[in-house]
Structure formats: structure tokens, C-alpha cells
Amino acid sequence: MKIIQVENQVEGGKVALELLKEKLAQGAKTLGLATGSSPEEFYKQIVESDLDFSEMTSVNLDEYVGLQEEDPQSYRYFMNQHLFNQKPFKASFLPNGAAKDLEAEVARYNQLLTEHPADLQILGIGTNGHIGFNEPGTSFDSQTHLVDLTPSTIQSNARFFDKMEDVPTQAISMGIGNILNAKSIILFAYGSAKAKAIAGTVEGEVTEELPGSALQKHPDVVIIADKEALSLLKH
């Protein structure tokens, strides 16, 4: 596991862009993408670059259940706004959270990940160490699955919705097994709220109680983080 300390998210995005260029030069064809504030600056750097993704494929970590893709809170909408509209890929795959048959959609997406394993997977990490929507207790072997969101996740998402009953209670997420299948992984972490999760991910016991610790089992992980997120590391 390699750790790169950066001043802020802007520098983190620039560092990640250089790593992406290296992977593309080595023939990377499929990118695993994430949503949320952590990779936003990275996508901004990509959009401002001269990189061309018209022959590339992308696969996303997760999507909320019950939201149409044009819903501003859906992850498809987020990806369109921050990356796909400006830098189209040959194919961009996300789980379909509006699917009528969710079990069939989970199976379809898992098969798709088998056909398009990520050459480079982008990750953020939750304060409790979750990666994707894989909460503590998720098996390291897990494949794409339907997740019941924790009360704390539902509560923290409530600010984005007019009514509490509109807040999604489930998501479709890549499993930890799918994530570990990627050839290379970049994880972004910023702020002191992430310090405990990063300490456990890098130096803690490898345990399913801290999903991020699964990354210790992977041969090519780069963590891009600021001083605050790295503040609890012992070494």
C-alpha cells in the first residue's frame, strides 16, 4: 500500500490524474468509478485534460434503489454532471436502481463486472470504513448485492431530499470481492473525520468489521490523503 500525502483535494486530483495517465499508457481500458465529494476534484482534472475516453469503458460502484437516472440525487446523474457529459466513454455502466426486478439487476450487473474487470478502481471511504455501500460486517468475498442502508446513512442523506420518505433505504453495490478484483486501486480520503478509518485500513487488523482493511490484501493500492486523514497513522 502506497500513501501519498497531499495539501488538499485539488492537489489530490492532480496526483490521481498523473496516476491515471500512467495506467492508460499501460493499456488500461476499464475504469471503476465512485461518487461523492472525494473524487470530485479528480473528475474536474480529467474534464480539463486532453484525455479521450471514447474507446474506454467505465463501471460504477453503486446506485440508490428507487431513483430514476435523471433524478438529481442518483449516482448516474452525478456521473453525467461531473464526467460523462464532458468526457463520454464508449460504455458507462451503473447499476439500474429503478429496475423492477432487483435480484435480476444484481445478477446482471455482477455478470457485467465479470466481463469488464476494472483496470483502475477509484474509491472513497466512509467514517466507519465502508467502501462502496459495503458496511461493517460485509464479507470480503461479497459480490454485487442489494444493501439495506444503515440508519446513519439514511439520516445523513436526508438533507438532499424534501421529505424523509423520499430518502432511499436501499442501494445496489459492488461487493468487496468485486472491488478487490480491480488491477489497481486509488482511494481518496480527506479530513480528520476519515482519520480513524484510514488508520484501520492501513495499519489495523484485517477484519470484516472494517471493510477498508480488505485493501491490505490487494497488491496495488494507492491512498491519496491530506494530513488530517493521515493523522492517526503510527508509521
From Swiss-Prot:
It comes from the Bacteria. GO terms for biological process: carbohydrate metabolic process; glucosamine catabolic process; N-acetylglucosamine catabolic process; N-acetylneuraminate catabolic process. Keywords: Carbohydrate metabolism, Hydrolase. The keyword Protein transport does not apply. The keyword NADP does not apply. GO terms for cellular component: cytoplasm. One of its GO terms (molecular function) is glucosamine-6-phosphate deaminase activity. The active site is at D62, N128, H130, E135. Belongs to the glucosamine/galactosamine-6-phosphate isomerase family. NagB subfamily. This is Glucosamine-6-phosphate deaminase. It comes from Streptococcus sanguinis (strain SK36). The gene is nagB.
